[in-house]
């Protein structure tokens, strides 16, 4: 087991303000050889007095990063992107052979096929991926311990994730800020993911309306799930899961007792 108690309570990718974070930079020229870095190289200030006022200047910043990432495939173990992720930058990031942790806040990256190159990846957050067309490439990441996918509007079936036998934490949710639900066919895939210790499932609609696969999560310690008529009917049975101790199911019974 990899996840610690703090990660089980709050989520592996929860941001604590008092914790040290990697340095945040914009341009390749600011890089000082760190293995962990935050790169915010898009959505740059385009005002008239900015060095990035032209589209060409802004594009050059992204191009330089793409070139650097491809030509230096062994430098990073952790990368965070808090500004818009375009497809070409996503593909370049997937050149990083030693990457163990990747956090993408949001972007337009419909093709994630190259992520299967990141065989050492353990922690993956793909935010606001409404254009993503397939999650099959993620199923190749056999060392994944924790996965968050947000707003994958085109994905109806999450069965490919059952290949991730080391996965302890799984978050599947829509756009919680809009808010906008995602719709998936079923959560039957959970019956083959009994190793999960953390499962969060918000702003999501299950077309089958069958939530009984939740009862197969015999190792679950944190369970946070959107209330619904079907979930509420199962609430007492869910509480009997042998290792359950965190999440809205435990901390917010009023959500499910309406």
Name each model feature, range by range.
Residues 3-112, 120-189, 195-258:
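Concave beta-strand-loop units of leucine-rich repeat
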